[in-house]
Amino acid sequence: MSRKVTKYSAVLAVSLFAAALAGCGSENKEGTVGTGPGGVATVGDTACVQCHSAVVDPLTGESIITQYTRSFHYSKGVGCEGCHGGGAQHNGVGPLPFPLAGQSEAQIAARCASCHNGVIAPLSSSPNFVNGNHANPFGGEEAKENLCSRCHSHEGAIFGAQAGFTGDGNILRNAAYQPVYPQDPETFNVMTCATCHQHGGAQRQVFTQISTAGVPNSRRTVAWDPNRNSINDQYDLCTSCHTVNTMTGTLIGSGNVLQIFTSNAVGSGTKSVTTAPFYHNTRWFRTLPSTHYDFPESKTTASGTTIEGYVIRRNTANPCFDCHGHEFQTNTRRLAGADRPNTIFLDWGQSAHGGKLLQAKVAAAALASSGAAEVDDVMKAGATDATAPGWTHYNWDDTASRGACQRCHTSTGASNFLNNPAGYDRTGAGNSFTHLAGWTSSNKRSDQNELLYCWGCHTKAGTGELRNPGAITEVYPGINSTSTGTTGLDVTVSYPDIKGSNVCMGCHLGREVGDNIKAITDADGILGFVNSHYLTAGGQLFGTTGYEYATRSYANPAFFQHDKIGTAAAPGTGTNGPCAGCHMTTPTSHLFLPVTKDGTGAITAITSTACVTCHAGTFALTPEGLTAEEEEYVASLEALKAALAGKGILFFNAHPYFYRDTNANGIADPGETVSSNAFTNWAGVYGLALWQDVMGAAFNANLLIHDPGGYAHNRFYSKRLIWDSIDFIFDGVLNNDVTAAIDAQVTAARLDSATATAAKAYLGATRP
């Protein structure tokens, strides 16, 4: 038999010890007689235990019955016969429908796969494991070496865990700690299900060795418990090889003392962080904290931070399965390469949802010196305001100051909202961030920040199962201010059920819509700008977010289909709605980009299958054509900004976004872009009766400037909002003089002629 077949068979064979969840086998461990899997009557666990209590784990010597009683299967009432079939014909010597011994590899594999197929038992998916790195290590010969076998072989992992050969490099490199294996490592095998799981499926216990400093002969073996919760849990098991911190809490790294830059309102400097050496402490991609730790010390502004890595929820039941399931193959050592096939993890690490964190890590590694210095530099690299302001700019988990933002700027808030939109507390009071360093129920703040992690959108990363908020009904709160005497009513918008894309809608609908302005009562039209917030593509898609001028129609043309992508109304575009249909039907689905771009921002390829499916033949899209439309869209917004500047309303891309042009030069000068100079006198442009229409033009500009894909999401809606806003703000009348309005900005030197030409090409000579 080939070695490959033997390995595959061994992987699946051992998983028989954990083969059934409720519903797979029908046998009850309490002894109720019935028909078990295989059609043979059952006799109950008591009869099995009578003979098999003396059978022991061949590597640890522990009773398999003792192991089984610690398992999830036992606690859920799935007994021996749930895997092995009814025992009425067995009696110690007779047949069992599904015995372990004497069966062919194909029979054993088929039996295990009946439950461990990624569907019935999604958290224990045998196919994912078989195709992952644990069953297929990069260097198979590492399993044959005495020291390396601790984490690169089945037997070595079990023997080492039992002997307390677990911890940082100081332990693993110390000959006194190394166990004497009862068999030659040359006979060791690659990892199987039973490397981590005992008979019945419970996690194996891991031990380490500790000693008291200065006390001779004080070394002793204790349970490996780096999250210090006195529970044998998944964090303990996984970090026994993928070590994050020592038993005393010291961060794993190169072993050097890191200097972490910090800055706050008082001043700036560095803070020292001691690391313990990992065994592989000279390559960043072999040291887990290089990507799985966020330094709370790294405050880069009074309120912002650098996010150096993912924060593990250490004390939850499945902290590693939050993202990995049994996949175990990330391929994140580099950004690309034929020898590193694409994975969801590779995509996410380069995406905006992931703060482009992996790009920062790979770039730091490329510039670093080799060895421990590489590990240090990569550990300190991270997402910043330059690449990920939505995650780094504020301390989003600070409930007192940012609770209302947590729904979309933290994974915790996003997951809680998507689980129960109607019951979600908008103040953030119901969000717990106890997995972040220093966050408690009393202070409710931490200097670590989250990105949008897998578990923010998914309930089960192993299967990709999404959270299910249902169709989103968004309540946009009314605008009220006692200081300006402003009152406003809530605006409620019910969006259609778009299946998996409902998850996206949870954060891409904006915080205010144009109708919020119309719902305001204000005595003098002097008030702060109503801000749509960022990336409101879902609202644009369904034509609900903009400020719509009276007498003008904003209904989609009959042939408009973008809001139907991913539904039965648009065959061939998927079943998960328009957001997923366009942004996730690409070879790099979790980059969330339907196109690729070069370094200049030009579109080089259209990768979304939805785009290609619909835009064929006469309506085929080309990268060049789409790039031109994007450029013209941006130009039209520049024209709108110029028209607003002509009325003394300057746009600057920082809250509150619109400022007074105090020197009437049409340029947002540094001294003008301060909050004390915010534009507030909307009635001063065309009178009190029209103040809402004036703010509406500014609202539409801000809305679409912050939707860079607005030219594609719903180009008809976007064009009409821009057209009407320019039309009105130019002379206070809706009279379709947009071409003249744009030309006037060129004459006034607020817009260059090339941009004006592109804007007119995008909007056309008549209202879209």
Curated annotation (Swiss-Prot):
Lipidation (S-diacylglycerol cysteine): 24
Name of the protein described by the UniProt record: C-type polyheme cytochrome OmcC
Residues bound to heme c 1: 48, 51-52
PROSITE patterns: MULTIHEME_CYTC (PS51008), PROKAR_LIPOPROTEIN (PS51257), PROTEIN_KINASE_ST (PS00108)
GO molecular function: electron transfer activity; metal ion binding; oxidoreductase activity
Induction: Not regulated by Fe(3+).
UniProt source species: Geobacter sulfurreducens (strain ATCC 51573 / DSM 12127 / PCA)
GO biological-process terms attached to the record: anaerobic electron transport chain
Residues at which heme c 3 binds: 112, 115-116
Binding site for heme c 5: 193, 196-197
Gene name in the database record: omcC
Signal sequence coordinates: 1-23
Coiled coil region boundaries: none
Membrane topology, from the record: Lipid-anchor
